[in-house]
Amino acid sequence: MRKIILIFFIFLILQNIYAYEKIYDVNHVCYYTLTSVELQKFVKTAEIITPLNADNKTTITKDTILVGNPEENPLTKKYIGFFKIKINKTFPGKNKGIIEKQIINGHTVILLAGSDIQGTYASIITFANLNDIPENPIICETSNKVNIYSTSLNSEYFRDFIEKNILTPKEIEKVKSLSYKLKGKDKKATIENIAKWVANNIKYDYDKCKKIESGKFSWDEYNTPSETVKTKKGVCLDYATLTSALLLNDNIIPYMLDVALYNTSSLKISSYHASVAVKIDNTYFVIDQQPYLIPINEYTAQTFEDNLRIASIVMFRVVKERDGIKLIKEKEVPGIAIYGDLINLLEMRFNN
């Protein structure tokens, strides 16, 4: 009997340690709830530390809103031990974030962070709709993602299609002679030659793009690398697969990028884009339909057509294996601009 009671008390203690309020789905959050004077005052006076400005901050000296998980924000990493929920890249999970209040150095600190950028988005949007500072941690999530006919590289099925039908050893071999023509005096020169050739010789296929957007499109209509060379046109994925094939033939590892783009007015993901990155002297450079290389930190800050910006990038290393080509997930790179836009939304919300 004592053993049962002891187990029950341990269960209660563990439940209390990890207790949090119900999971909020930001798709069902209304703009905006009435907020308490305390919450409004806190947000207006608190210092907001995001991955954009965390490098110059070494300690908490006033009421603070910490934005971003420990891998993105060094100040979050320093103080994560103070929080009940130890957020990381895998917990609470994809598209999930947390809101948690703690007292650190005598100051109120609110952590708004996600396992990924979509989780951070969920935590900020949910926090903006609270009517008071939460006493217990909140886990929130969003289904703010777009699956345009599953043409995102994050789809295992779509990657499998590319590996078996587009970037096959046989198809890569067909553009080998072109790769040799573009080979430069060193790795960087070769990459620059490939970027220039693709940008100058391949035109964007707007008709195919319209078909994709309308849904009147099948995967089989994507080009193989040799088809892109022959027709001299393609959409972003066609550019990316051709570029990857040319790089592979010159023994350069390409990284195909799955780029999630968000609308700056709604801050919601609206589409996905494909491009390629290469690594030169431990720095990633992006090749994206332009005759030059773009450092990835500059690329993540770009604004695209229709006022779209990068929410996040998932990198897939393209490798040759015995049985063919594999796209292996390398890492996720958060967009730079989205942090600023989310904080602007938060400040606008509480300055009204």
Swiss-Prot record:
SUPFAM superfamilies the UniProt entry points to: Cysteine proteinases
Xref: InterPro entries: Papain-like_cys_pep_sf (IPR038765), S_layer_C (IPR022651), Transglutaminase-like_domain (IPR007562)
This protein's name: UPF0252 protein MJ1282
Record-stated family: Belongs to the UPF0252 family.
Organism: Methanocaldococcus jannaschii (strain ATCC 43067 / DSM 2661 / JAL-1 / JCM 10045 / NBRC 100440) (Methanococcus jannaschii)
